[in-house]
Amino acid sequence: MPSNLVPQEPCLDVERGIAAMGSPSALRLVLQVAYTSLQQDPPVIAQALAAGDIQPAGKRLHGIKGYLPLFASEALAHGISLLERRCSTEPADTLIAEFRELRPSLAQLLSQISSYLALESLPRQTIADER
């Protein structure tokens, strides 16, 4: 996969997510599910591809492809979408290399989701007027 498909910008787009989901609380719920998926799915995808078992990898990529457009950068969502489609036409060795290119961005997205969820769980502080 050409490296120009690997996103260079932040992977999590909170404004896009809130617009897609309708509210910060709805986005939070989706991000909690995505967080679990992004923890579990990439290692399973890598193992399946390494074993030459493309179908399970494609199914997991299909799931990720379904939610990324809601809150991820366009570049990352596009890259995963292309990889998922290529699961029906390309050999495992090709897919392994392409997934290896995208995996750091998925890890970055996971980290950004974790940070966002941690910030959103903090109690809101009001600043007292110091007059």
Regions found by a protein language model. Give the residues of each.
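Two-component system phosphorelay core
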Residues: 1-131
